[in-house]
């Protein structure tokens, strides 16, 4: 089914704003805009190869990031960026198909620069998504990972996600190897209040 062009949701959550991480590091949070393609591309290309291995799409490719920006403009995706010194240091994104039978679901994607890990940035970004999800009509967030992404699985479990399924040989990594896919979900209503 082809998606109809949908206008982006007008979010009430204030952006941009500065937050302090657990170690006192300040980062600026704001929403990604179509004009951020080159900055997001620079961030993606700065990530270690291991981080890119299991991404759903290759965000180091200009075309992929341009399509991402088009999805933002069309209202299918909302991405929160974390910046320091005008450089992207992390993002959380939720993709939402507003016209399908899964219109109550949002797919979560989070990526944090290595220098900003273990500081709580991934948690901050995830909470931003949970805070804005109700405004988008999202009732449940879905996260996909491979079983060897142990840190990511632990993070989403701590955030209230539960494992729903393991799909065997379901994804192919960048080297062409098949991997299992772990599907985890979390009800937005259960966590949205803690995100505000």
Segments predicted by a language model, with ranges:
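Acetyl-CoA-dependent GNAT
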Residues: 57-104, 109-113, 126, 187-189
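A short beta-loop-alpha structural element at the N-terminal edge
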Residues: 27-39
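Conserved beta-strand-loop-alpha-helix junction that forms the acyl-donor binding cleft
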Residues: 117, 143-153
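Conserved catalytic-core motifs of GNAT/GCN5-like acyltransferases
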Residues: 142-145, 157, 162-179
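Conserved GNAT acetyl-CoA-binding A-motif
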Residues: 126, 133-145
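Glycine-rich phosphate/pyrophosphate-binding loop shared by adenosine-nucleotide-utilizing enzymes
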Residues: 25-27, 85-91, 179
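Conserved acetyl-CoA pyrophosphate-binding loop and the N-cap/start of the following alpha-helix
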Residues: 116, 120-128
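C-terminal "cap" of GNAT-fold acetyltransferases
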Residues: 169-196
